[in-house]
Design a protein with these regions (language model features):
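Nucleotide-sugar donor phosphate/pyrophosphate-binding loop at the beta->alpha transition
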Residues: 72-79, 114-117, 124-147
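N-terminal strand-loop element at the rim of the active site
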Residues: 5-73
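Short His-centered aromatic/hydrophobic patch
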Residues: 95-101, 120
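A short, active-site helix/loop in glycosyltransferases that binds the activated sugar's phosphate group
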Residues: 147-160
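Glycine-rich phosphate-binding loop signature in dinucleotide/nucleotide-binding domains
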Residues: 84-91
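Alpha-helical elements of Rossmann-like donor-binding domains used by nucleotide-donor carbohydrate transfer enzymes
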Residues: 21, 76-83, 103, 139, ...
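Active-site proximal beta-strand in glycosyltransferases
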Residues: 3-4, 92, 108-123, 141, ...
Length: 160
């Protein structure tokens, strides 16, 4: 079974550390071909790249996948992810984080991936963002939720 995990950045943080641990653990299970796709690591938080660098073929970088809303790069990321998913033909695409979750689920649907999973590590929207970004994320999450086959939450508070 071929599984692709997708996260926006490999920075030091809970969602990223959880994703890397899951990918490395699943990669050792017989019958699973597990890989990770991420945007470029930037930010003062620090990087988790060293944890995956020693695993050949594990990480694919997608420079168009960036954290801020950027219509041109976001559309480019969807196109590149769609092409990647069509080429690799995964059985499962498992997305993590708000931006990768929305763009990755859309690309997986466009590529005909049969199982699309999204883990909610924390809110993608809320009072911590401006009203425009907040509204955009809410609409995008509602839309992506329509073709997400499974949701995983890391805490019961995220289920709502």
């Amino acid at each position: 079974m071929r599984v692709i995990h997708l996260i926006t950045r490999l920075i030091v943080g809970g969602a990223q550390e959880n994703t890397v641990a899951s990918v490395l653990g699943l990669r050792r299970k017989p019958g699973l071909d597990v890989t990770l796709v991420a945007g470029l690591t930037t930010g003062p938080e620090g990087s988790l790249e060293s944890l995956v660098a020693s695993e050949p073929g594990l990480l694919t970088r997608l420079p168009a996948l960036v954290r801020p809303i950027h219509p041109w790069l976001d559309w480019r990321a969807v196109r590149e992810l769609t092409a990647l998913f069509r080429k690799r033909r995964p059985d499962i695409v498992h997305t993590h984080s708000g931006k990768a979750g929305i763009l990755g689920r859309l690309a997986a649907r466009r590529a005909g991936v049969p199982t699309i999973i999204h883990t909610i590590h924390g809110p993608s929207f809320g009072p911590f963002q401006g009203p425009l970004a907040n509204g955009a994320f809410r609409c995008a999450e509602r839309y992506a939720g329509r073709f997400t086959t499974h949701f995983v939450v890391v805490a019961n508070a995220m289920a709502d």
